[in-house]
Amino acid sequence: MRKLAFFLFVVSLALFRGQAHAQRCLPGMKGIRLTAGMADGFYSPSSKNETSYSFGASLATYTKGGNQWVFGAEYLRRYHPYRENRIPVEQFTGGGGFFCNVLSDGSKTFFLSAGVSALAGYETVNGGKKLLSDGSTIRNQDGFVYGGAITLQAETYLSDRLVLLLYGRERCLWGGSTGHFHVQYGVGLKIMMD
């Protein structure tokens, strides 16, 4: 009976001592990233004709030191006010970049990374329609865009397979006719794979 009580005591100590963390950010580990964010300002009901949003999906592959290569695609939609209406500008981009681990805690739960990416894609203004409902003509052209982005991202592990992302990003794209720079910020989830 004493052996059983001692065994249960040791097991309970092991269970309530704390959670054991799996090894994280090892070279070759991969994760699927899903992100959503805002661009070029904050949303408010008074500025709904000028807001923009983005969605993205990418694959992150870790290298030594918690650094990572990220390759993926992103959709960004920005509205430009026009009288009582708004004109949508959409960018479909693909890109790849390298993120360098800047800061992490000892338990490998929190990471701060800085990254540089190359981007290329297509920009369309008002869905390719040149004529507006009031008879005006849009002069901006649809076309291919190219450029890059710098990113600052924070990651925190919610579990061994689920990571919460917070990011800020500055995109600079040439080739489009609606502006070069777009500031983005948002949240995302990374699902770690074996």
Give the predicted meaning of each segment.
Residues 42-45, 80-87, 134-140, 172-176:
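Extracellular loop and loop/strand-boundary signature of outer-membrane beta-barrel proteins
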Residues 35, 52-54, 70-74, 95-98, ...:
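Residue-level detection of beta-strand scaffold positions
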Residues 58-133, 162, 191-194:
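Gram-negative (and chloroplast) outer-membrane scaffold detector with strong preference
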Residues 78, 153-194:
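Predominantly the C-terminal beta-signal and adjacent terminal strand-loop region
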Residues 20-71, 190-194:
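Short glycine/proline- and aromatic-enriched beta-strand/turn motifs that initiate or cap beta-hairpins
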